[in-house]
């Protein structure tokens, strides 16, 4: 039985890493059920909208009702054929637009040091305008400071979501922006600008991609994964290696587990912890050369891409850091030692 079929746990770490590493290649996958749906997408999307709408009517006015309402909007967008963002109004258009003020609507505590912040877009029928593998800039000016603090963040909401933009923010001890965002309460506003294009993704651009992430570096990876698996025409295979300090530091773990369970033959995830609990059966310590050599697609496979995103120390060890947002810098570290070329690696 396939490893992917046999394991349906929330964490890939439920199976010992030694067992996981026995399988490097994916089995040939037949056309997915989604690819066979064809015109049923409209029917199912409309049905989803109707169900979500019924839930909203029943819940009327409660916090859960707001989430149901968002599902109605998103399902309706899908039922309408998922219009491209060029065909709907975009909140962030880049260029000469300048900064846009967004109101914080909702705050969700994710774990001991991370929050999900939902900001309302200027109009309810707008999409953010942030495409796959893109980011935004955030800005605020501390009291008595001469200059504002500006930091990039990758939104985690679907690019087709209407009326809102979500940021997943980890608070760092000496991080002025992350501290400011964690201190915000609903009703306050944040200046944002974008989108900032990173990697120009298109369906089936690569046959297999590998994602090496650390901490909040998972956000652009998740954005990319969701776009791939939400598109029935995109048959890209994905391998994720995700490093964190402790188990409760693993961000988006439920969402990643759902993607893995729904796409067991095209998506596998490996988790590594610096400070694992006693019951942990996944990787321990740092992301190592042996681990990457075992689970990543081989560099001799031409139609692959390895994406890397994480704290500076991890980036330095895995691929070398970027010189600037527009300069990828020299390829160094483990990936170079394993034989990957600069053209096969992208640093977020």
Swiss-Prot record:
Intracellular or extracellular location(s): Mitochondrion outer membrane
Similarity remark: Belongs to the flavoprotein pyridine nucleotide cytochrome reductase family.
A GO CC term assigned to this protein in UniProt: mitochondrial outer membrane
Major localisation: mitochondrion
Keyword Protein biosynthesis attributed: no
Top-level taxon in the UniProt lineage: Eukaryota
Membrane topology of the entry: Single-pass membrane protein
Keyword terms of this UniProt record: FAD, Flavoprotein, Membrane, Mitochondrion, Mitochondrion outer membrane, NAD, Oxidoreductase, Transmembrane, Transmembrane helix
Name assigned to this protein: NADH-cytochrome b5 reductase 2
Catalysed conversion reaction: 2 Fe(III)-[cytochrome b5] + NADH = 2 Fe(II)-[cytochrome b5] + NAD(+) + H(+)
């Amino acid at each position: 039985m396939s490893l992917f079929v046999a394991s349906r746990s929330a964490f890939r770490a439920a199976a010992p890493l030694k067992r996981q590493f026995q399988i490097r290649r994916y089995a040939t996958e037949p056309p997915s059920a989604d690819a066979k749906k064809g015109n049923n997408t409209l029917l199912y999307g409309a049905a989803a909208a109707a169900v979500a709408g019924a839930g909203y009517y029943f819940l009327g006015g409660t916090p859960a009702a707001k989430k149901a309402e968002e599902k109605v909007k998103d399902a309706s967008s899908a039922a309408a054929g998922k219009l491209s963002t060029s065909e709907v109004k975009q909140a962030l258009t880049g260029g000469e637009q300048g900064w846009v003020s967004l109101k914080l609507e909702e705050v969700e505590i994710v774990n001991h040091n991370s929050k999900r912040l939902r900001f309302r877009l200027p109009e309810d029928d707008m999409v953010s305008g942030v495409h796959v593998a893109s980011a935004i800039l955030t800005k605020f000016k501390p009291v008595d400071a001469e200059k504002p603090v500006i930091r990039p963040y990758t939104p985690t909401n679907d690019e087709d979501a209407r009326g809102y933009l979500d940021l997943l923010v980890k608070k760092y001890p000496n991080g002025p922006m992350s501290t400011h965002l964690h201190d915000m309460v609903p009703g306050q506003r944040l200046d944002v600008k974008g989108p900032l294009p990173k990697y120009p993704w298109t369906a089936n651009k690569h046959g297999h991609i590998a994602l090496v992430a650390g901490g909040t570096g998972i956000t652009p990876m998740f954005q990319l994964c969701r776009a791939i698996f939400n598109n029935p025409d995109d048959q890209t295979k994905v391998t994720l290696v995700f490093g964190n300090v402790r188990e409760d530091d693993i961000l988006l773990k439920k969402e990643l587990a759902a993607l893995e369970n729904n796409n067991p033959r095209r998506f596998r995830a490996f988790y590594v912890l610096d400070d694992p609990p006693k019951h942990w059966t996944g990787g321990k310590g740092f992301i190592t050369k042996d681990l990457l050599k075992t689970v990543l697609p081989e560099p001799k496979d031409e139609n692959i891409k390895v994406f890397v995103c994480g704290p500076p120390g991890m980036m330095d060890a895995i691929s070398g850091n970027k010189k600037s947002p527009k300069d990828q810098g020299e390829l160094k570290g483990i990936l170079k030692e394993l034989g990957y070329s600069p053209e096969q690696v992208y640093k977020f």
